[in-house]
């Protein structure tokens, strides 16, 4: 019989000659540190061993990982919980473990470099002091709300007492990441220093002994009084509800739990925190948000093709417009890759350079970047009106007008001027990639790479191989997207690809509701209340009414009359309305020099143009149902036809590309939640009410008959 070897501990203690202990957190076999349930015993053990040292003066907690302190708790622990009580117990274990650090008899200081998030920041908050590195990789935050949860190991109680209730609520409710200098200003850390002296600074802080707690700013002290507290929580609750529309229960519970701790004491706060954590862990919203987290994490590790990607050294971009400028920006500033832009004139190149300058300047103004770093990143972007420098690029991303012959010409010119290995990636939103590659000498190196506007903010790209695109080209294009900070889904070369294909029927149904006399604001409000970030009419104005009408004929030609856009769009376009970009759309936009309106107002002349009298007659839930059911039906068709590789990819595409409500997990998770049989019955009812275009697709009918789901039960 062989004796089973104990797992190596993630917490290693070293006692220095000056009697200061250094606890190094290094989870074996993992790239980053995440906190796991089994670490409770390991933390207990390391603290007991430290206590046994008779002359111990203090402890410093550091990470053994190169650029990560603790990335958070391992959320697979939550999936293992089957009841709220089990999840509550998990939170209580975390609380009691960190309470041991907080109650330790000598000073404990956290030396933070890299990501310090979720349970990682809660651990740091339990320490008696915190210092962090000034490195760009250092970020502190409590992002649990983004998983439909709240910090469950004391974060809702310690943070308000450290930096004040208003700033703590802002951090916890948004899940935002705080950089080093901002953390210092907030009082979240006691010092921020270069990484090279981080450990020494933490040791010096321990040697200074117990420090008196930093006094909160007078504004925060004012808000601690009964009147200030009542006012603060009233304002926060109102603002939060305006953002969440009541769709995210975690936000309301965070406010309640923080208030409980401040009103009834920290012990009551911990009790409320653990109970709320347990209950939130069992909500469908948290399950959906966690599924998106796992899906996006998995996608970031996938290559997209059965081949190794080629090395990427330089990138070329054709076109310096809005899309070209945005692509250049993310390639240089996030990917760290030199970019060469070609445009027909200097104005286009300057436009692209200004795009990156404006994005980086915003970071400089908010003190998230130094001017020297902005200059360094701008140096990565250059431009030319000819193809000089293109013989060095590995991928060329084409972002010119939506014209097939022009794009084919671009392919020919790149094959002439670039290296034989250069990949041609087209940022088309509607043209078939196979047609763009039709005259190519190396069609296996032509692919679609569809970005969404604004490029620096939208996280999704669609990677679109055509019939003869090579696996190496797919893998290299996905690798480039990852470098740009994007989540990539590989979709088939079919009309509209995936995102635009499911978006078109959704927008068309909103237009039909408009033609029935439903006011513009009422339509948008219905879908925002449902959970979309903006309504369908606002979205059309933002994307461009002309862009929407260009995609529609392609969809009708290849997929049939159900994609025919209502005549309303043609009438609006003929009136010279393209949306926000030309200041004329479904909404009013202030002209230059005019003051911006606090709330957007619909342009009532649109009603005259369309010959309708606006009157709200449909219930908000009915409007949302009509629009969303069209999207769900089309998403199921896309899966059936192989446009997307999996329900997972379809959910990520809809949430990251359109803003499908994250708390529903995406179209496929939502259909599972409703039950496919109910989806089919709803579509059949709408079909009887409004027409054949609501007919449920074969995939949904088949699944309903057989009682099937898109995801396994409990996954």
Curated annotation (Swiss-Prot):
Subcellular location: Cytoplasm
Name assigned to this protein: Fatty acid oxidation complex subunit alpha
Entry keyword set: Cytoplasm, Fatty acid metabolism, Isomerase, Lipid degradation, Lipid metabolism, Lyase, Multifunctional enzyme, NAD, Oxidoreductase
Pfam families (alphabetical): 3HCDH (PF00725), 3HCDH_N (PF02737), ECH_1 (PF00378)
Family to which this protein belongs: In the N-terminal section; belongs to the enoyl-CoA hydratase/isomerase family.
Recorded catalytic activity of this chain's protein: a (3S)-3-hydroxyacyl-CoA = a (2E)-enoyl-CoA + H2O; a 4-saturated-(3S)-3-hydroxyacyl-CoA = a (3E)-enoyl-CoA + H2O; a (3S)-3-hydroxyacyl-CoA + NAD(+) = a 3-oxoacyl-CoA + NADH + H(+); (3S)-3-hydroxybutanoyl-CoA = (3R)-3-hydroxybutanoyl-CoA
Assembly notes: Heterotetramer of two alpha chains (FadJ) and two beta chains (FadI).
Annotated spans, Enoyl-CoA hydratase: 1-194
GO biological process: fatty acid beta-oxidation
Any one GO molecular-function label of the UniProt entry: NAD+ binding
Lineage, broadest ranks: Bacteria, Pseudomonadati, Pseudomonadota, Gammaproteobacteria, Enterobacterales
GO cellular component: cytoplasm
